[in-house]
């Protein structure tokens, strides 16, 4: 008999759709938007991730722009902790600290407010998908600049073949995902 975690994993996998050649040829994009049509499934996802993070006692949850916000705010609320929005450059209204990181072609920049993380703050980092790990690694560098402590990474999906964990392990080895491909 399947466990509740296995049933949740099967339900998530059967709901996510693959979009071939998006955003560019050769890519198979994992589209999580169909999950948002099912409030009970969303609630189960939030509860499962919350259950993973609660024993670690994070002080804050840093959520990555933009799909990390979809479940991240609810997870932070369930944990009773602040959500720290990590945004693309120019999207936050207050003073920011930034980190530039490499893409396959070029670079990108993410930011957070300068007052988002206090020294010693225990931060979990959440996003929808762990692929190459570039954005999560840049977020780790932002948290470290603010003298925060990274205690966990939380993802809905991990694309194992891209080995994103390898980039994140130097910052924290607690790397959790609900489903793996």
UniProtKB/Swiss-Prot annotation:
GO terms for cellular component: cytoplasm
Gene Ontology MF term list: adenine binding; adenine phosphoribosyltransferase activity; AMP binding
Catalytic activity line of the entry: AMP + diphosphate = 5-phospho-alpha-D-ribose 1-diphosphate + adenine
Keywords, sorted A to Z: Cytoplasm, Glycosyltransferase, Purine salvage, Transferase
Disulfide bonds, paired cysteine numbers: none
Subcellular location(s) per record: Cytoplasm
Gene3D superfamilies in alphabetical order: 3.40.50.2020
HAMAP family: Aden_phosphoribosyltr
PANTHER family: ADENINE PHOSPHORIBOSYLTRANSFERASE (PTHR32315:SF3)
Function: Catalyzes a salvage reaction resulting in the formation of AMP, that is energically less costly than de novo synthesis.
Subunit field text: Homodimer.
Protein name: Adenine phosphoribosyltransferase
Gene: apt
